[in-house]
Structure formats: structure tokens, C-alpha cells
UniProtKB/Swiss-Prot annotation:
InterPro entries: NA-bd_OB-fold, RNA-binding_domain_S1_IF1, S1_domain, TIF_IF1
Family note: Belongs to the IF-1 family.
UniProt KW RNA-binding keyword: yes
Pfam families linked to this entry: eIF-1a
One annotated GO molecular function: rRNA binding
CDD domains named among the record's database cross-references: S1_IF1
Record's function text: One of the essential components for the initiation of protein synthesis. Stabilizes the binding of IF-2 and IF-3 on the 30S subunit to which N-formylmethionyl-tRNA(fMet) subsequently binds. Helps modulate mRNA selection, yielding the 30S pre-initiation complex (PIC). Upon addition of the 50S ribosomal subunit IF-1, IF-2 and IF-3 are released leaving the mature 70S translation initiation complex.
GO CC term (a single one): cytosol
Gene: infA
SUPFAM superfamilies given in the database record: Nucleic acid-binding proteins
Protein name, per record: Translation initiation factor IF-1
HAMAP family, per the entry: IF_1
Domain of life: Bacteria
Length: 72
């Protein structure tokens, strides 16, 4: 059985939360809870409030996501 494709959207980090979690506001105005992807954690990429990021959302739960890219 094939896995569903993740939905990729852009957003802005609102606030950092404990355990490398972040509150992110998406372009459409929704707020989601997102964690850092493994590669970003491995390369010590820091994310601060106000950063523009790319978030992958699961089609099953649109309130949680994974931050995959921090834009310059």
C-alpha cells in the first residue's frame, strides 16, 4: 500500500516550544505545531521566531507538521 504524499506549505515561525517544537503560522493563516526534520537537527540549523520555513503536513493530521527548510 503506497504512502500518502505530504503536503508542502510555507509559513512563519511564531514561537519556539520545548523539545525542538515550534508554533508556525502558514500562509493561509492556520497555526500548526511543527518539529525539526532529522537532517536539520543533524546539521545544527537554528530556527528563530520570524524565520520563513517550509513545512510538510501529513494528509491525515493537518495540525502537526515537520519543518524541512529554513529560507534565507
Amino acid at each position: 500500500m503506497a504512502k500518502e504524499e505530504a503536503i508542502t506549505v510555507d509559513g512563519t515561525v511564531l514561537e519556539p516550544l520545548p523539545n525542538a517544537m515550534f508554533r508556525v503560522e502558514l500562509e493561509n493563516g492556520h497555526k500548526v505545531l511543527a518539529h525539526i526534520s532529522g537532517k536539520m537537527r543533524m546539521h545544527y540549523i537554528r530556527i528563530l521566531p520570524g524565520d520563513k520555513v517550509t513545512v510538510e503536513l501529513s494528509p491525515y493530521d493537518l495540525s502537526k507538521g515537520r519543518i524541512t527548510y529554513r529560507k534565507k
